[in-house]
Amino acid sequence: METVFTEKAPKPVGPYSQAIKVGNTLYVSGQIPIDPRTNEIVKGDIKVQTRQVLDNIKEIVKAAGFSLSDVAMAFVFLKDMNMFNDFNSVYAEYFKDKPPARVTVEVSRLPKDALIEIAVICSKG
């Protein structure tokens, strides 16, 4: 088991790792829209926040030797399901050809009052 950390993604806001690599599988902790340069939530709508979350995930999987095409499963937590279509429009830019399996649920609140959080599982082979 290997801990994955990159300065190109935000530091965890609690006692957990950015990601854990076990063999050919990578477990990426839930990411919220924190700009790693400022350590603050990005200001903006669900599209802006989704883009930041996916950029953070992209950097974490890259640091572990994976890519977004290796994402097998995504877990998405939205503050408001009315944001679903706008979220999907940005999400589709990152997962064009073979999107991963996905769960999307509405939650009452997220850390730092983010609008979105995404966790992923990647697999090679």
From Swiss-Prot:
GO terms for cellular component: cytosol. Coiled coil: none annotated. CDD domains: YjgF_YER057c_UK114_family. Disulfide bonds: none annotated. One of its GO terms (molecular function) is deaminase activity. PROSITE patterns: UPF0076. SUPFAM superfamilies: YjgF-like (SSF55298). Belongs to the RutC family. Gene3D superfamilies: RutC-like (3.30.1330.40). This is RutC family protein STK_08110. It holds the Pfam family Ribonuc_L-PSP.
